[in-house]
Amino acid sequence: MARFRGSNWKKSRRLGISLSGTGKELEKRPYAPGQHGPNQRKKLSEYGLQLREKQKLRYLYGMTERQFRNTFDIAGKQHGVHGENFMILLASRLDAVVYSLGLARTRRQARQLVGHGHVEVDGRRVDIPSYSLKPGQVITVREKSQNLDIIKESVEINNFVPEYLDFDADSLKGTFVRFPERSELPAEINEQLIVEYYSR
């Protein structure tokens, strides 16, 4: 399945979650798009709820179905709770960490920064958004990319960095200190529904 490339605003309103991370999509119209959006009261089936939750998380991270399912399967082979492991793996992706450090205003921008080669891990350029970080690894912006407006503006307005990360705004240097705990990740996602979806 290809990555969704339509309107993130409409998709955010349909799923009830901000896919950009800014929350602007839901400020004025916190309901589904379309003529009947404000009055939609359709009750979803159990399968519908599971599917919607899966789509929310997949679109949030901008992943193809194959990438998403592969990560889910990897999480299932780890010790611990499958759903929580899955959420932690997603949050440990390089593009997700670049976004969480405040180097990009949206997750899509973070994917682009990584994909275009603006980011280094432990001093080596990494252009794979799905690159999985390990505790202790250092994320930096390449020297020739540090004056990009998109990065400077993002860092300037960002006022929160999760506790599992460390960030020096002056040097644009971040450290993946540890794996996040579930409580530090998106609370609007019910990952158990996703586990149930793939267990059908």
UniProtKB/Swiss-Prot annotation:
| Cellular component terms per the entry's GO annotation | small ribosomal subunit
Q: What is this protein called?
A: Small ribosomal subunit protein uS4
User: SMART domains annotated for this entry?
Assistant: Ribosomal_S4, S4
Question: Which terms are listed as keywords in the entry?
Answer: Ribonucleoprotein, Ribosomal protein, RNA-binding, rRNA-binding
Q: What does it do? A: One of the primary rRNA binding proteins, it binds directly to 16S rRNA where it nucleates assembly of the body of the 30S subunit. With S5 and S12 plays an important role in translational accuracy.
Q: Which GO terms describe its molecular function?
A: rRNA binding; structural constituent of ribosome
- Family annotation (InterPro entries): Ribosomal_uS4, Ribosomal_uS4_bac-type, Ribosomal_uS4_CS, Ribosomal_uS4_N, S4_RNA-bd, S4_RNA-bd_sf
Give every S4 RNA-binding domain span: 92-155
- Source species of the chain: Staphylococcus haemolyticus (strain JCSC1435)
Any matching Pfam family: S4
GO process terms (BP): ribosomal small subunit biogenesis; translation
Q: Which domain of life is it from?
A: Bacteria
Fill in the subunit field for this protein. Part of the 30S ribosomal subunit. Contacts protein S5. The interaction surface between S4 and S5 is involved in control of translational fidelity.
> Which SUPFAM superfamilies does the record associate with it?
Alpha-L RNA-binding motif
Q: What CDD domains does the entry give?
A: S4
Protein family according to the UniProt entry: Belongs to the universal ribosomal protein uS4 family.
